Amino acid sequence: MVENKQSRREFITLIGGAAAAWPISSRAQDLIEKAPRIGFLQRVQNENVVAFVQELRNLGYLVGQNTVLETRIFEAALDRLPDLANELVNLKCNVIVAASRYAFEAAMRATSTIPIVGIDLESDPVASGWIKSLARPRGNFTGLFLDLPELCGKEIEFLKESVPALSHVGVLWDSIIGEVQFRATQTAALAAGVTLHSLPIENPQDFNAAFDRASREHLIQGVVVLSSPLILEQRSQIAEWAVKARLPTISLFTLFPRAGGLLAYGPSLPDMYRHAAIYVDRILKGSKVADLPIERPTRFDLVINLKTARALGLEIPATLLVRADEVIE
């Protein structure tokens, strides 16, 4: 995908380029050896990592100069996660940033002492038993998580406003990590008087079966696309299928309508990664991770793709358009 190729170039410029340009000397080597070491564990390398590194730079942490960033990417190989998490522990990282439930669960199993900053859209850290409270997480874990019930309610609301006769909705979700999010969507749909149809996926091969099922169930009038790294990767395929099936869609990924989906309402992922860098800064400056509260994103964007709306034969109400943060013509 274009975004991933671009972000890889940016990542190399920010990290690899900085390290390559730094003169090799005993003094520089000594500085690097004494530099704070940040571990970063996530499924894919993308533009969000660039936002994280840029914010580190703003805070005075120059990767390859006075800071070491140890990045581990596990892609679809979940079985590699324990080894990758243990690598970061053995490298004596001062803090580990773990993006996605897979990543921070592996990190928590690997260490109970190194501070972990989690970034996740699919989980409830209290209900999952990872922390005791949002205000005082305790242990070695903190981070950024969504208020799923409120967000899922808004997604149903915006989809229903776009399709006033909406009464049956398909839910495309990752059944490995998305159960909490799916239950929150069920609750929101019940409150809105909408019947849900589950369209679970676990791997890339499941998407066609989910699409076929949605097409066969003629009652479905729209689809809520829940979040997971896998679903984000497949956003263009999902958007293309939805237009062919003439099904309005909404996702919490703002990249989704830019790939051809109808609607998105969700947090700015680059902002979340920038905020993770602020957590890292506070930890490296001596704050106890147990005293750093779990935080919710404060910025949410509504994005509407009018080109897709026209292809679906929909007229988006003016009341919704005026609330949009971005309209794609």
Where are these regions (language model features)?
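Short hydrophobic alpha-helices and adjacent helix-cap/hinge residues
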Residues: 1-329
